[in-house]
Amino acid sequence: MMETMPNWLKQRAFLTPDRTAIEIEEEKVTFMQLHEKVVSVCEHLTHVGVKRGQKVAVLMKNGMEMITVIHALSYVGAVAVLLNTRLSREELLWQMDDAEVICLVTDQDFEAKDIPVYSFAEVMNGPKEEASIQEEFSLREAMTIIYTSGTTGKPKGVILTYGNHWASAVGSSLNLGLRDDDCWLACMPMFHVGGLSLLMKNIMYGMRILLVPKYDADFIHKALQTRGVTIISVVSKMLTDLLERLGEGTYPSSLRCMLLGGGPAPKPLLETCVDKGIPVYQTYGMTETSSQICTLSADYMLTKVGSAGKPLFQCQLRIEKDGVVVPPFAEGEIVVKGPNVTGGYFNREDATRETIQNGWLHTGDLGYLDEEGFLYVLDRRSDLIISGGENIYPAQIEEVLLSHPMVAEAGVVGMTDDKWGQVPAAFVVKSGEVTEEEILHFCEEKLAKYKVPKKACFLEELPRNASKKLLRRELRQLVEEM
């Protein structure tokens, strides 16, 4: 098995220098132009002291600047720690400290006492220094670290190697196929693995990317009709937005795939897509699997409603209960294996040992396989709230609530929301006088906006079992009765 590969972007620029790599609004950049931009960024980063093996935090919005920084860090041999722009300052500082980054590169106003902060403009306006560009990538080396929350609510840095990203792109191509005229519309944030994976596919496939800096349903709807887009990644809310704008119309037949993540879509939504000839491929994946690991072909979108499909070609999947593989239709934990699966979490040896055993990743998600091997996901890590495609862990919100001096107990569950699918709802036992407004304002100061509960309800006591474990299902029943 190969241990190294040529520098991906440099090789792509050599093979197809004049092919369009990235389109942003009206700007077009070829692969050779992209390579040249990246070399320049690489030389500027070298001047500020970035070296091979170091970890550099990246806090940027979708755009050419972020693309060039991610590639430039790989040219240097540094590890990109990709930060979610929607997180609070406290959350970002915690992740940077945990990842042991040497600096932060950002396109935003941000201050940190113990970490050098460089604005992208500041870096590019400064001097250059000759860089030692990596001619080859070791597939075993870490390329990125992306933070994901575990069921404890404590974020964990998922280490993804060059080999993980390569395997993910290969698996996707074997599943969806490749065409010379392919163009993938990228509207997912690149700090998420789903958005980042498109940058990898871009240079590996030599495929054009139409990058949308910020989610804009009107722009995306028009682009699908006029810009030659063949593939787009979406979540259910985005698909709903697009169908609303489509009305009685249809999209061009050249749109060959809508890759749908973030949970199963409702059957009426899929039926509308079938009527309009929109091929929807439902997927299942996570940061730890470098994006998708299962996909349901559009051929089965109505006959296997709710299924996430079968594993990608080089991946394996099984359902376990108490360490034993269970038969079809028996519920259990989803366990996966493949070359796209992370080797572990940064500085979290215990979590790595607990989650990954003999190469098998224990996802913490519940599901079952039918008699044909199609996966059905029952619960996303059981307590997980998925809001507009963003993962929200109740434990993190509860930790913030419990830090309020007038809160004795706290429990958080998901509440159905027409716009976002789910939003957090909090239940609180007071230890003193406090209002709902004060509780919510306190959360706004500590959490990303999408994590702030939409309601805070007061109870005399929280429902618990004999072991005093919080019974979230009873809180969910209370939410349904509201």
Curated annotation (Swiss-Prot):
Reported EC number(s) for this entry are 6.2.1.26
PROSITE patterns (UniProt xref):
AMP_BINDING
Keywords annotated in UniProt: ATP-binding, Ligase, Menaquinone biosynthesis, Nucleotide-binding
Q: Which organism is it from?
A: Bacillus thuringiensis subsp. konkukian (strain 97-27)
Source domain of life? Bacteria
Catalysed reaction, written as an equation = 2-succinylbenzoate + ATP + CoA = 2-succinylbenzoyl-CoA + AMP + diphosphate
The metabolic or biological pathway listed in the UniProt record of this protein is: Quinol/quinone metabolism; 1,4-dihydroxy-2-naphthoate biosynthesis; 1,4-dihydroxy-2-naphthoate from chorismate: step 5/7; Quinol/quinone metabolism; menaquinone biosynthesis
Identify its protein family.
Answer: Belongs to the ATP-dependent AMP-binding enzyme family. MenE subfamily.
NCBIfam families in the record, alphabetically? menE (TIGR01923), PRK03640.1 (NF002966)
- Alphabetical list of SUPFAM superfamilies matching this protein: Acetyl-CoA synthetase-like
Its biological purpose: Converts 2-succinylbenzoate (OSB) to 2-succinylbenzoyl-CoA (OSB-CoA).
> What's a GO biological-process term for it?
menaquinone biosynthetic process
Lineage of the organism: Bacteria, Bacillati, Bacillota, Bacilli, Bacillales
Q: Which GO terms describe its molecular function?
A: ATP binding; o-succinylbenzoate-CoA ligase activity
Protein name (record): 2-succinylbenzoate--CoA ligase
The record, for InterPro entries, names: AMP-bd_C, AMP-bd_C_sf, AMP-binding_CS, AMP-dep_synth/lig_dom, ANL_N_sf, ATP-dep_AMP-bd_enzyme, MenE
Major enzyme class:
ligase
